[in-house]
């Protein structure tokens, strides 16, 4: 059962850096719905993309799966035999709850839920890979290598879904969308103290890129096509496609 996020409603003397610990895992569904505009749409559309891209006898990877929302959306939309979903997260608290969520919904497609580092996972025989608000928590210097590995592990015609919080090269636009996002959180019941404390904890851990930077990395990895398919304020999602005739 998810609880309402009140983690930062009182002043915290020493904030430290953000971690996906048991306290965060307990309130995560409420937190992300109230903090990430368009999150529910992205999750449901990931399922629609899965219906289009997942092929028989292949694997789907959910890298940084948290509580398994994207995994469940994908699994609901797989209608082929001999497919498997591999869901990975490095947070023990998230993985424990993810396993409970996956087990609560029965479906023919098996799911391997793995506690581990996505940088160490081999990507093989993949028709679809999901990075849903995950890449932004890696060191920027490590992001290209992960995208390279994903491209190599995708089958021809496969797709990567990359959802992120964005920064903007146009400072005026960036300021507007930053403020709109804060308005969104206020409208969802977060106080100025909650917004400020969470931002302070995240600022050294979540380092955002522009859409242009993401597209450049995807192109360097080998993806022939990539495009922003969803955006709400400074959050959005790209889809990158490996050509059907790729070697």
From Swiss-Prot:
Reactions catalysed: prephenate + S-adenosyl-L-methionine = carboxy-S-adenosyl-L-methionine + 3-phenylpyruvate + H2O
InterPro entries in UniProt: CmoA (IPR005271), Methyltransf_25 (IPR041698), SAM-dependent_MTases_sf (IPR029063)
Name used for this protein in its record: Carboxy-S-adenosyl-L-methionine synthase
Lineage of the organism: Bacteria, Pseudomonadati, Pseudomonadota, Gammaproteobacteria, Enterobacterales
Gene responsible for this protein: cmoA
Matches recorded under HAMAP family: Cx_SAM_synthase
Family indicated by similarity: Belongs to the class I-like SAM-binding methyltransferase superfamily. Cx-SAM synthase family.
Enzyme Commission (EC) number: 2.1.3.-
Amino-acid positions noted as binding S-adenosyl-L-methionine in the UniProt annotation, renumbered to this chain: 39, 64-66, 89-90, 117-118, 132, 199
Keywords: S-adenosyl-L-methionine, Transferase
GO molecular function terms listed in the Swiss-Prot or TrEMBL record: carboxyl- or carbamoyltransferase activity; S-adenosyl-L-methionine binding
Protein role: Catalyzes the conversion of S-adenosyl-L-methionine (SAM) to carboxy-S-adenosyl-L-methionine (Cx-SAM).
Record note on quaternary structure: Homodimer.
GO biological process: tRNA wobble uridine modification
């Amino acid at each position: 059962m998810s609880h309402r996020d009140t983690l930062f409603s009182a002043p915290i003397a020493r904030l430290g850096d953000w971690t996906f610990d048991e306290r965060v895992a307990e309130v995560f569904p409420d937190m992300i719905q109230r903090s990430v505009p368009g999150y529910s749409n992205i999750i449901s559309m990931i399922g629609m993309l899965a219906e289009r891209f997942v092929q028989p006898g292949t694997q789907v990877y959910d890298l940084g799966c948290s509580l398994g929302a994207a995994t469940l959306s994908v699994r609901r939309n797989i209608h082929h035999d001999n497919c498997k979903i591999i869901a990975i997260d490095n947070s023990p608290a998230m993985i424990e709850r993810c396993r409970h969520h996956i087990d609560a919904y029965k479906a023919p497609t098996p799911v391997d839920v793995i506690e581990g580092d996505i940088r160490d996972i081999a990507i093989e025989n993949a028709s679809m890979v999901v990075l849903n608000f995950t890449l932004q928590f890696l060191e920027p210097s490590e992001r290209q290598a992960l995208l390279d590995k994903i491209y190599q592990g995708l089958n021809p015609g496969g797709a990567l879904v990359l959802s992120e919080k964005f920064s903007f090269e146009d400072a005026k636009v960036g300021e507007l969308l930053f403020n709109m996002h804060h308005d969104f959180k206020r409208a969802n019941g977060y106080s100025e103290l909650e917004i400020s404390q969470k931002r302070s904890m995240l600022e050294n851990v979540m380092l955002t890129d522009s859409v242009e930077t993401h597209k450049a990395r995807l192109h360097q990895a080998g993806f022939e096509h990539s495009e922003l398919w969803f955006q709400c304020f400074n959050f959005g999602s790209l889809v990158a496609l490996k050509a059907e005739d790729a070697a």
